């Protein structure tokens, strides 16, 4: 189209390029990622101070339990109730 005012013969509908619907092939990421299922777990460990058995029960995903397991094998440890009372004086200073 050239000129100040377009006229009907200036518009050729067959040559118009229509934009592609950009959302037609897209999906929301949450549709692709399934909700991770949480399961109950029992974690048996020992007290760092007196070496008695400590059991922790929780609900978590498999991936979270694997991360927690790595922590327990490296630098994370538990205290039993008796040792936590003695060593930490029930949180009092």
From Swiss-Prot:
The keyword Ligase is annotated on this UniProt entry: no
UniProt region (E7 terminal domain), positions on chain: 1-39
Tagged with keyword Methyltransferase: no
Keywords annotated in UniProt: Activator, DNA-binding, Early protein, G1/S host cell cycle checkpoint dysregulation by virus, Host cytoplasm, Host nucleus, Host-virus interaction, Inhibition of host innate immune response by virus, Inhibition of host interferon signaling pathway by virus, Interferon antiviral system evasion, Metal-binding, Modulation of host cell cycle by virus, Oncogene, Transcription, Transcription regulation, Viral immunoevasion, Zinc, Zinc-finger
Modifications the protein undergoes after translation, according to the UniProt entry: Highly phosphorylated.
Compartments where found: Host cytoplasm; Host nucleus
Pfam family, any one: E7
GO BP terms in the entry: DNA-templated transcription; symbiont-mediated perturbation of host cell cycle G1/S transition checkpoint; symbiont-mediated suppression of host innate immune response; symbiont-mediated suppression of host type I interferon-mediated signaling pathway
Zinc finger (unnamed): 47-83
One Gene Ontology molecular-function label: protein domain specific binding
Subunit structure: Homodimer. Homooligomer. Interacts with host RB1; this interaction induces dissociation of RB1-E2F1 complex thereby disrupting RB1 activity. Interacts with host EP300; this interaction represses EP300 transcriptional activity. Interacts with protein E2; this interaction inhibits E7 oncogenic activity. Interacts with host TMEM173/STING; this interaction impairs the ability of TMEM173/STING to sense cytosolic DNA and promote the production of type I interferon (IFN-alpha and IFN-beta).
Comment, domains: The E7 terminal domain is an intrinsically disordered domain, whose flexibility and conformational transitions confer target adaptability to the oncoprotein. It allows adaptation to a variety of protein targets and exposes the PEST degradation sequence that regulates its turnover in the cell.
Family from the record: Belongs to the papillomaviridae E7 protein family.
Protein role: Plays a role in viral genome replication by driving entry of quiescent cells into the cell cycle. Stimulation of progression from G1 to S phase allows the virus to efficiently use the cellular DNA replicating machinery to achieve viral genome replication. E7 protein has both transforming and trans-activating activities. Induces the disassembly of the E2F1 transcription factor from RB1, with subsequent transcriptional activation of E2F1-regulated S-phase genes. Interferes with host histone deacetylation mediated by HDAC1 and HDAC2, leading to transcription activation.
Name the record gives this protein: Protein E7
């Amino acid at each position: 189209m050239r000129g100040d005012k377009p006229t009907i013969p200036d518009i050729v509908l067959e040559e118009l390029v229509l934009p592609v619907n950009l959302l037609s092939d897209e999906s929301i990421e949450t549709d692709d990622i399934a909700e991770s299922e949480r399961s109950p777990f029992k974690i048996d460990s020992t007290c760092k101070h007196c070496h008695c058995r400590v059991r922790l029960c929780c609900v978590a995903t498999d991936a979270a339990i694997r991360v927690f397991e790595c922590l327990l094998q490296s630098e994370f440890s538990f205290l039993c109730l008796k040792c936590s009372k003695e060593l930490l004086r029930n949180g009092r200073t």
